[in-house]
Amino acid sequence: MTKNESYSGIDYFRFIAALLIVAIHTSPLFSFSETGNFIFTRIVAPVAVPFFFMTSGFFLISRYTCNAEKLGAFIKKTTLIYGVAILLYIPINVYNGYFKMDNLLPNIIKDIVFDGTLYHLWYLPASIIGAAIAWYLVKKVHYRKAFLIASILYIIGLFGDSYYGIVKSVSCLNVFYNLIFQLTDYTRNGIFFAPIFFVLGGYISDSPNRYRKKNYIRIYSLFCLMFGKTLTLQHFDIQKHDSMYVLLLPSVWCLFNLLLHFRGKRRTGLRTISLDQLYHSSVYDCCNTIVCAELLHLQSLLVENSLVHYIAVCFASVVLAVVITALLSSLKPKKAKHTADTDRAYLEINLNNLEHNVNTLQKAMSPKCELMAVVKAEAYGHGMYEVTTYFEPIGVFYLAVATIDEGIRLRKYGIFSEILILGYTSPSRAKELCKFELTQTLIDYRYLLLLNKQGYDIKAHIKIDTGMHRLGFSTEDKDKILAAFFLKHIKVAGIFTHLCAADSLEEKEVAFTNKPIGSFYKVLDWPKSSGLNIPKVNIQTSYGLWNIQSWNVIYQSGVALYGVLRSTNDKTKLETDLRACSFLKAKVVLIRKIKQGGSVGYSRAFTATRDSLIAILPIGYADGFPRNLSCGNSYVLIGGRQAPIVGKICMDQLAVDVTDIPNVKTGSIATLIGKDGKEEITAPMVAESAESITNELLSRMEHRLNIIRRA
């Protein structure tokens, strides 16, 4: 994901694009060459507005979303700017006689919604409408269909803009466009023009390997083609307006990808200045024309000379933007150094380590094997949204969850990978299985019949019980297993088993595991001998890959993906360089001075044997940190040193002794799982101290901990 990366190329071009927009409204070369001015203002400069749309889409639109907060914030901010701009330009509207028009109220509504109350303000309602359309299209139908729908809208707009002369001669189309023009003066608006650029911006952001060095040549070639085509359209006089061209799309696409090459320090000032300049250039255009020309008698210099006029407008606009930026900056309260995400306790998720583990496991598998990521229980406490939205871009396209509700959440996040539900789903929810295209595990013959009886087409995997004796068909149920292939509403897409003893290298356990493996492969022969296509085969266990790894199957990997073993004593046949992905941390919120003999916590479980410094951490067993680590059974790391847990761990807090650790203060970071200096506490170590396993420890976390993604 790229939303928080810094792209200085985009920041610099924002400023250039703002200057281009000023050029569109001031025609800087008109005094010297009408053709040159046309080329500059009607071929080169029009890339500016689509660039702004695409930039907004790049940082706003994503198929991976867990809510609409970013969209809401964007619309709220843009609406506020639009409202201020409308009020700011009322004097100019009065001067131009805007309020003397016929049908004033419906025209004001039309202008506010589509065209802007002053010509150049159309960009703001277009941004609001275009962002909303693009966001919901991508959310509901993914990029391919979203692009198709946005393209259709763009084509409709195209024939109401640059190609209007063609459709005007076709009576039915002319009627259609006349209806459109009763609602909006132009098709260059938030419905027809903006959505496709927002969609493309989001697609670029979500897509890996998007940079191409050949963009220099492509941009030059496309602009040459657009130059010829635009002059042709002008020559035949078929344009109603000149904002929308076919070649504008690939031109802005290549330009934007080129700008992504340039990384560096964020230029927040340039962003704000270019924004203010864009919205205020027309003010100074009017001021230069009216005030300077009439009061200072400089018409020949500031009005009749178009280039000087343009420079004056740009200069005045930039000065105003700098002043406004400085004023707003001085009035804006300074942000605290910490963020809300890390002000209490939090999990750090290292995405680089996650990708490393995926690559390591894939290399350990035979070439025909594939990886299915088990993301149940909030991806083993790592955050289901944070993890799954990272898996697809790095090439993991099979996911497994425990419940239907987990699967539905993934679909609502924007996940399009195959999702297998490992556990039971009530047959009464078959409609949801079908609607969200989830793959259901068939747990026995009776369940199979009930699911088919619901009347919804359901994709399913048959589970074979090879010794776990929980869910699944017996290896003796040949007829019942084969029956699944012939039911009307069940589409068998896979067969899998769950090895119950693959985590052990003891000879008797290895022998036990090998026996059901043979039975499982015997089951796989039944469909083949009956002339049926053998569906995908998968094995449910990380330890099956580590200790046996001899099949051409899909491996369901859970704990291995997250770089940990179940316990510190586990040994595996295959040694892999896996790296832990989650690190639990909390901030010191208070330091208490406890005199010798003083106590801390419930039941006075800790009594100080000396004058002590006790640090209070805002994390407890409600955050998933085990209560049986109380009273010195574990420790945390602060400043690279061990701080023992004292007293009983509470629901929301715990106390640690920092008497022997220098420079501990409020705000110091305590590491409960992770590395600090030369010291390290691993998840298996904490789990062992709590007399548990890593799976349980991690899956109990996340529910109210903030998750910070590090890449």
UniProtKB/Swiss-Prot annotation:
Pfam families: Acyl_transf_3, Ala_racemase_C, Ala_racemase_N. It is an enzyme of class 5 (isomerase). SUPFAM superfamilies: Alanine racemase C-terminal domain-like, PLP-binding barrel. The modification N6-(pyridoxal phosphate)lysine is found at residue 376. GO terms for cellular component: cytosol; plasma membrane. Residues 1-14, 59-78, 139-146, 210-241, 328-711 are cytoplasmic. Residues 36-37, 100-117, 168-188, 263-306 are extracellular. Its EC number is 5.1.1.-. Gene3D superfamilies: Alanine racemase, Lyase, Ornithine Decarboxylase, Chain A, domain 1. It is found in: Cell membrane. One of its GO terms (biological process) is D-alanine biosynthetic process. Substrate binds at residues 470, 651. The active site is at 376 (proton acceptor), 602 (proton acceptor). Its cofactor is pyridoxal 5'-phosphate. The chain crosses the membrane at residues 15-35, 38-58, 79-99, 118-138, 147-167, 189-209, 242-262, 307-327. It is a multi-pass membrane protein. Keywords: Antibiotic resistance, Cell membrane, Isomerase, Membrane, Pyridoxal phosphate, Transmembrane, Transmembrane helix. Its main location: membrane. Residues 336-711 are annotated as: Racemase. GO terms for molecular function: acyltransferase activity, transferring groups other than amino-acyl groups; alanine racemase activity; pyridoxal phosphate binding. The keyword Transmembrane applies. In the N-terminal section; belongs to the acyltransferase 3 family. In the C-terminal section; belongs to the alanine racemase family. This is Amino-acid racemase. It comes from Enterococcus faecalis.
